[in-house]
Structure formats: C-alpha cells, structure tokens
C-alpha cells in the first residue's frame, strides 16, 4: 500500500514539474522565463510614467518623486 501511495506522489510531482517547465523557453529554467516576463512588465510600467534622468540612473524600482518632475 505504501509503495502505491509513494508511486502516486512521485507521479504527481513529475506532472507538476513538467507542466511548470512547459512555460519556459526550450532549454531555459522556469525562473529565467518568469524573470523575463517580470522585466517586460516592469518596462511597460516605466514607459507609462515620466521619469527624470537622475531617477533613471537609480536601481529598480525607479520611481520619480513629484518634486523631481517639476
């Protein structure tokens, strides 16, 4: 009984790992694919908000305070 239960658990883990990796680019780890998506979304948000040159040189997240834009 325990062997069957362990086999089912391992099978479910394998299915989860395979489905998780299906989103990644071929040969890339899932975390890399998720990081690329996060960077793309961050870039889109940056384009929506004006930002000064001083704040642009700062490390992310780049948020320009009001006094900087005036």
Swiss-Prot record:
It is found in: Secreted. Its main location: secreted. Expressed by the venom gland. GO terms for molecular function: toxin activity. Residues 1-24 form the signal peptide. One of its GO terms (cellular component) is extracellular region. Contains 2 disulfide bonds. Belongs to the scoloptoxin-04 family. Keywords: Disulfide bond, Secreted, Signal, Toxin. This is U-scoloptoxin(04)-Er3a. Disulfide bonds: none annotated. It comes from the Eukaryota.
């Amino acid at each position: 009984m325990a062997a069957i239960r362990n086999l089912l658990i391992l099978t479910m883990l394998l299915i989860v790992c395979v489905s998780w990796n299906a989103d990644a680019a071929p040969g890339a780890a899932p975390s890399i694919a998720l990081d690329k998506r996060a960077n793309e979304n961050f870039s889109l948000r940056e384009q929506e908000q004006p930002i000064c040159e001083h704040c642009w040189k700062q490390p992310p997240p780049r948020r320009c305070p009001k006094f900087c834009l005036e």
